[in-house]
């Protein structure tokens, strides 16, 4: 069992000499992801976009709760022949926005997948997480105003969801999604 086996044996025999961890000790997550197997195979890019948008709603919510942003995104797909493929990329600006994560994931998917087979499952993962309080270096050539507006808009939407109901604000695209499994809610808590 290697070094973990040795550590397990030492702990089981009371030979643990590591310092006691404080109760408020918080170990930040290194990645956050969410995936789903759909009720029927995804055959169009629109189906994949809707699925990714749904998945990133959960990821964005968890990033907000943990006060983190993603500096990268990873996409894992499994087709109807159960072949798995995975891609990842860095984001130009770290984000906690579910729509920005969905756009990056979908762009990565579109540029990498050739639609050899319909898709059975999709997983989106926010990677290279950083603190939300960390300053961000902006690029003068990008549309930073639109990026900031999207971040602020989603922050307001999350505040409304926290105050009233998790389903009080839902992207309209998710209201017509047929390919996904039955859920009691579109957002976290209904999984």
Regions found by a protein language model. Name each.
Residues 1-116:
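DNA-contacting surface of Y-family translesion DNA polymerases
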Residues 91-191:
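Acidic, metal-coordinating catalytic segment for phosphate/diphosphate chemistry
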């Amino acid at each position: 069992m290697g070094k973990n086996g040795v550590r397990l044996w030492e702990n089981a025999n009371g030979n643990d000499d590591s310092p006691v961890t404080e109760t408020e000790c918080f170990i930040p997550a290194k990645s956050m992801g969410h995936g789903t197997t759909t009720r029927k195979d995804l055959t169009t890019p629109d189906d994949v976009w809707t699925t990714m948008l749904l998945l990133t709603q959960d990821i964005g919510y968890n990033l907000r709760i943990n006060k983190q942003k993603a500096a990268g995104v990873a996409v894992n797909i499994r087709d109807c022949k159960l072949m798995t493929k995975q891609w990842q990329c860095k984001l130009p600006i770290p984000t906690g926005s579910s729509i920005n994560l969905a756009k990056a994931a979908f762009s990565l998917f579109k540029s990498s997948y050739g639609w050899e087979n319909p898709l059975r499952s999709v997983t989106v993962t926010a990677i290279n997480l950083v603190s939300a309080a960390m300053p961000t270096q902006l690029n003068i050539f990008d549309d930073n105003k639109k990026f900031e507006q999207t971040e602020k808009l989603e922050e307001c939407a999350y505040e409304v969801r926290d105050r009233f109901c998790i389903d009080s604000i839902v992207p309209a695209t998710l209201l017509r999604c047929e390919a996904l499994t039955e859920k009691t809610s579109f957002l976290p808590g209904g999984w």
